[in-house]
Amino acid sequence: MSKIIGIDLGTTNSCVAIMDGKTPKVIENAEGARTTPSVVAFLEDGERLVGQPAKRQAVTNPTNTLFAIKRLIGRNFADPVVAKDKAMVPYEIVKGPTGDAWVKAHGKDYSPQEVSAFILQKMKEAAESHLGEPVTKAVITVPAYFNDAQRQATKDAGKIAGLEVLRIINEPTAAALAYGLEMNEGKKIAVYDLGGGTFDVSVLEIGDGVFEVKSTNGDTFLGGEDFDLRIVDYLADEFKKEQGVDLRKDKLALQRLREEAEKAKKELSSTAQYEVNLPFISMNASGPLHLNIKLSRSKLEALVEDLITRTIGPCEQALKDAGLKKSDIDEVILVGGMSRMPKVQQAVQDFFGREPHKGVNPDEVVALGAAVQAGVLQGDVKDVLLLDVTPLTLGIETLGGVFTPLIERNTTIPTKRSQTFSTADDNQSAVTIRAFQGERPMAVDNKFLGQFDLQGIPPAPRGVPQIEVTFDIDANGIVNVHAKDKATNKEHSIRIQANGGLSDADIERMVKEAEANKASDEKKKALVEAKNQGEAIVHSTEKAFAEHGDKIGGAEKTAIETGLTDLKAALEGEDVEAIQAKTQALIQASMKLGEAMYGAQQGADGGEEAAHDDGVVDAEFEEVDDSKPSA
């Protein structure tokens, strides 16, 4: 059975891990790094870059370099948070075929699921390279506060990448799994997870292998990217005051600002001041303009103070929902790159009244937890029971547009709940079931999940028909809805498909495109390797031919010259098999040349040995018998 891998698909960085015996272990990527930037770039010639290579070229190719794509996954184009993102990224966010947010690169539209799949493929390839076998199954993490549409979209991304997603697991829960794997005594812990694009807080009770999530809360549009944007705005405003030029209108300058903002934010976690220095950032009539601004830690803290404060409300709500006081929490675990910021750590300490635990790597702990869950599913990890919850209330729209809950938030999953409803009008023959997710009293203010019709209800006065509606949430947090007319036993059920989500046909097409791209990428790689080998053989043969060509016969010389000409011609083209064949032909033709070189070397060595014979001393050796006693 092939290994199940654990993947943390992050907004800024992603990470992959496996169970190595009883211990989860992070796998390094092709560049030798333990985390991979969640960045995808498309070049002019159609080549696609993923991870660090994509991030490195972002400044010179800002409109075709896609990052923070997780903030768009499962979101409608009309969503206000998408409009906010649209104004702040150099690439184009467009309306997809079904109204959801897509992105454009080199004139082609991509769904966030497809872009996420490119990142997942990179993780999959790293695992396959490490394990030396194909990988087809994975556990993928998502923010605890992701709704059904976002969870389904993440699962679809896995499918496009060629992975069967066995489980979607919440990021704070995964972190708790990694933290508490060896823990025997009972503890109540809070996981504060401030990542690149999302914030979650979960309260759990752990001990004796049981991980029970008591509550979860968060904000799926609050993270390190927002901190970066505050720095970008500050730098752009200061530059505009001094030079009268708004750098936000220049996509290349904006990308340089973003990169420098991220660097400044990281540096200011360990230093008191950072000098932002961007020469030739813009031009005016007088010539080039340079940006040079000193940014202090205190200034950064002032810029982002309200963002940090926004994380405290969900912490209060999570404690309230869990029925716990701050003093009941035994440990606070910090997760996500932004939790390294001293001001964030101080805010957490001030709220919970205890110093947070810093013994886990905030960039890797989520992937490690995903690997633990993978180990549980594989049967390698015993005696671990994970009881997670649904983050948002689920219900349907009833008369007057009211949101009627069926499953309250923080209900342990998997779960199933039923409730009986009736018709609103006399002789109504069909009802439309409209499912929503959220906490607002009116349905329209919550996240619309989907709808279906239950037809063929017998004519009856309003209020008489009995229609049973059942919500079913699986262990991934994905919703199914079922409606049944009790009089006729007619029923209808659907797996909720996000309004604007990918259809099965879309996913199938994207899977095929991903496979085709993989084949194309492998072909390009094979061509590069064949050309490298061919060019190396040409170089070494020409060098040897120049030095030792006079030591071989005319027929061998002709064969080598022909071989060189043929291989050089093949190297001009892109036929891998032709290059490989001509390379082998030249290797065969130059074997006599190799013998001549070897003979010349032997002769040189022989002369050297003769020269040293004068210094050789003859000696007699006695064979030692180990059985004889030593003196």
From Swiss-Prot:
- Which residues are annotated with the PTM Phosphothreonine? T198
Has UniProt tagged this entry with the keyword NAD?
A: no
Can you name one GO molecular function term for this protein? ATP binding
Q: Which residues form the signal peptide?
A: none
So where does this one cross the membrane?
none
Q: What induces it?
A: By stress conditions e.g. heat shock.
Key words, A-Z: ATP-binding, Chaperone, Nucleotide-binding, Phosphoprotein, Stress response
SUPFAM superfamilies in the record: Actin-like ATPase domain, Heat shock protein 70kD (HSP70), C-terminal subdomain, Heat shock protein 70kD (HSP70), peptide-binding domain
Task: Keyword check for DNA repair, yes or no.
Answer: no
> Which CDD domains does the annotation name?
ASKHA_NBD_HSP70_HSPA9
Give the record's family classification. Answer: Belongs to the heat shock protein 70 family.
State what this protein does. Answer: Acts as a chaperone.
Question: Sorted alphabetically, which HAMAP family does this protein's record hold?
Answer: DnaK
Q: Name it.
A: Chaperone protein DnaK
